[in-house]
């Protein structure tokens, strides 16, 4: 997937406080939640080398994952319903 598209999709999800998952080639999934209670989630895309850094955690432990955007098959975003 193009890093620019990844940036737009995750940027919109972050703005709206949504959750979802990044589905990688081979079946692996990385979940995210931009409105998790007690959890901070952030991301950064680098369009030059086509990578995505996504991280989440608390003030004690913050985990980062670095992903080659070409290995992203699709991104699912879930709307919050009441």
Language-model segments: residues:
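Intrinsically disordered, low-complexity repeat segments enriched in small/polar residues
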Residues: 10-12, 42-44, 75-78
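Acidic, low-complexity, intrinsically disordered interaction modules
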Residues: 24-64
């Amino acid at each position: 997937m193009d890093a620019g598209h990844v940036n737009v999709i995750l940027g919109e999800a972050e703005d709206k406080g949504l959750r979802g998952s990044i589905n990688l080639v081979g079946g692996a999934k990385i979940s995210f939640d931009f409105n998790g209670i007690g959890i901070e989630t952030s991301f950064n895309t680098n369009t030059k080398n086509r990578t995505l850094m996504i991280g989440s955690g608390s003030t004690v432990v913050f985990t980062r994952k670095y992903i080659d955007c070409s290995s992203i098959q699709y991104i699912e975003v879930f709307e919050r319903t009441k």
